[in-house]
């Protein structure tokens, strides 16, 4: 039974990832006043399937100087972690209702750094290594602010359990009392998922494709799927944290519809940002985080800690 549950979670995610690639190409196309994919199937709807068949039937080439084991493990690890992070997300019922769901999410996103590092290092190519080092520095840096923002939100929530966030936001979305945190969180998730304008790891003009430059066919497709699964997951997480979906215990379907709509809107905004903004310079990226976001998030975290104490109230206990 548990296997069926896992499959019922994983298969829709992989389908969503497949069609997100199509949506992205369509959105970028229309924003640049062209059509986007429209040959394969009606309105180009079969394009992702054609892409998948093409990628997985090609020969997976491998550089002769690369270290084989790591080269193969890295993409598998990337996709596995991307799918694992969906486990504690309440939609409205999570696959496993963890007491420390938020901590689990943080731990998994930190582990994702290893797949990037291994892929860059195992490729034995200087471009892949530079791309991997950039990606690792960026991901690790932005995780600092993500963790502090999460801490501030959890002080309002009262526990590390993600399901209680639904109850916390029954009357008021957390984006209203903590909108600066929400804005910084959104920008940090852009950086965390290596999306434009923070896609320095895959700067085409200087690094060809970044850490996955030596990958072809199947393994490359795994990296690609991991990236898009992470994008949808981060937006779902943002929805749960700040845009608490409407929850009526008698009609859980309404929650799911509400939740999916908000997640889709956020994902579309990711694509919109990609079409609108140029890439940051590397020093600007780091400056934004260490000089702007970190002091602000720390100050707001102290505010969230001290306010309940000052007003002699206690944070919600669960």
UniProtKB/Swiss-Prot annotation:
Its EC number is 7.1.1.2. It is found in: Mitochondrion inner membrane. The chain crosses the membrane at residues 2-22, 70-90, 100-120, 146-166, 171-191, 222-242, 254-276, 294-314. It comes from the Eukaryota. Core subunit of respiratory chain NADH dehydrogenase (Complex I) which is composed of 45 different subunits. This is NADH-ubiquinone oxidoreductase chain 1. Keywords: Electron transport, Membrane, Mitochondrion, Mitochondrion inner membrane, NAD, Respiratory chain, Translocase, Transmembrane, Transmembrane helix, Transport, Ubiquinone. PROSITE patterns: COMPLEX1_ND1_1 (PS00667), COMPLEX1_ND1_2 (PS00668). Core subunit of the mitochondrial membrane respiratory chain NADH dehydrogenase (Complex I) which catalyzes electron transfer from NADH through the respiratory chain, using ubiquinone as an electron acceptor. Essential for the catalytic activity and assembly of complex I. It is a multi-pass membrane protein. It catalyses: a ubiquinone + NADH + 5 H(+)(in) = a ubiquinol + NAD(+) + 4 H(+)(out). GO terms for cellular component: mitochondrial inner membrane. Belongs to the complex I subunit 1 family. GO terms for biological process: mitochondrial electron transport, NADH to ubiquinone; mitochondrial respiratory chain complex I assembly. Pfam families: NADHdh (PF00146). One of its GO terms (molecular function) is NADH dehydrogenase (ubiquinone) activity. PANTHER family: NADH DEHYDROGENASE SUBUNIT 1 (PTHR11432), NADH-UBIQUINONE OXIDOREDUCTASE CHAIN 1 (PTHR11432:SF3). It is an enzyme of class 7 (translocase).
């Amino acid at each position: 039974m548990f296997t069926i549950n896992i499959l019922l979670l994983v298969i829709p995610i992989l389908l969503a990832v497949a069609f997100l690639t199509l949506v992205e190409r369509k959105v970028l196309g229309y924003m640049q006043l062209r059509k986007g994919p429209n040959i394969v199937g009606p309105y180009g709807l079969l394009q992702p399937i054609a892409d998948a068949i093409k990628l997985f039937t090609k020969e997976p080439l491998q550089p002769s100087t690369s270290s084989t084991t790591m080269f193969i493990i890295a993409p598998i690890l990337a996709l596995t972690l991307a799918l694992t992070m969906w486990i504690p997300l309440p939609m409205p019922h999570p696959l496993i209702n963890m007491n420390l769901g938020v901590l689990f999410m943080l731990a998994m996103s930190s582990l994702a750094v290893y797949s990037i590092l291994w892929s860059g290092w195992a490729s034995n190519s200087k471009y892949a290594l530079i791309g991997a080092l950039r990606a690792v520095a960026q991901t690790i840096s932005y995780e600092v602010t993500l963790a502090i923002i999460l801490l501030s939100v959890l002080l309002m929530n009262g526990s590390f359990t993600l399901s209680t966030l639904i109850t916390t936001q029954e009357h008021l979305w957390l984006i209203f009392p903590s909108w600066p945190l929400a804005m910084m969180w959104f920008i940090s998730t852009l950086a965390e998922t290596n999306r434009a304008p923070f896609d320095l790891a895959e700067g085409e003009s200087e690094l060809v494709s970044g850490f996955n430059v030596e990958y072809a066919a199947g393994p490359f497709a795994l990296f690609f799927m991991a990236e898009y699964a992470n994008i949808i997951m981060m937006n779902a997480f943002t929805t749960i944290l700040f845009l608490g979906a409407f929850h009526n215990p008698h009609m859980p379907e309404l929650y799911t519809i509400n939740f999916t709509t908000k997640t889709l809107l956020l994902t579309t905004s990711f694509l919109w940002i990609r079409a609108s903004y140029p890439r940051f310079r590397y020093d600007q990226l780091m400056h934004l985080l260490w000089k702007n976001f970190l002091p602000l998030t720390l100050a707001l975290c102290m505010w969230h800690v001290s306010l309940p104490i000052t007003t002699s109230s206690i944070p919600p206990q669960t």
